[in-house]
Amino acid sequence: EETRTDKQNRLMWPLLKDLSDQVVWHGEKLTREEWKDLITVLVNQTQDQEQKSAPGINGGRVYFGVRTSKSSKRYMVDVIEAIYWFGTDRGVKFSEASSKRIAWAQEWRASRG
């Protein structure tokens, strides 16, 4: 499958910024990069894809987010839609820039059936 373009990679960052600005996750504000890790782990888990993890140094389990530079276009659409779903569920007011990216992802998916 075709690898995502730089433009597609840039599409997700305004959405991640909206999450970072508006969502407090278990009492903590997260960075855009931390949200990217959480969202990509979610996407992999919901698609039953292999999710890289390792035992934590002090116990527990650490899941590694996906580096999207080698991701497919379809995967990037899945990430954008997951951000939108999660944000909407948490009452995030998406910016105009984010709304345009969400519309692009929905149009892309609709054109692929």
PLM segments and residue spans:
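Acidic (Asp/Glu-rich) sequence patches and key acidic residues
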Residues: 1-113
